[in-house]
Amino acid sequence: MSAKQPKETDVIKELLSSYGKLQKRIDNTEERIAFLEETAGSPSSPSLSGMPSGSRERSSKQERDLIKLEELKEKLDAMTAEENMLREEIEEMIELMEKPDEQTAIEMHYLDQANWRAVSVALHGNEPDYDEYEERYLKKTFKIHGSALQTLLRIYNERNADK
């Protein structure tokens, strides 16, 4: 078996997907921060070994947790700044697209993390025969998405030719 041939639009898909991955990393980091904030100040469980443990060990763990918490907050700030820059870049390219349906497909799926059925409903849900031909409209949504990727690739290449 041969490896799947890369498509010319893969560079755009990767750019758009990287935004979603970054959002997920930010969400996960926020959860880690919340967890550490809850546990950093709480006393640790008593040792049942019978061996005395000094308060030095406890404060050392608390210090490590507080340091880790500060590092995560700095990391979160950096990721949030990167997310804002990436979103701005993507939104600027979307603004240059001429077809509103293409814009909506890209915005909903990649920026809003909507699934394809939700995108299809947004684009075609007002059609009188939508419920009857939902699968056809979903396929039409995929075609619009493919066309949108081609349009974004052209815009991306034009913007990066200047750099």
Give the residues covered by each predicted segment.
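N-terminal interaction/assembly modules
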Residues: 1-96, 124-128, 143-146, 150-163
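Short amphipathic alpha helix immediately N-terminal
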Residues: 98-114, 118
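Helix-turn-helix DNA-binding module
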Residues: 113-137
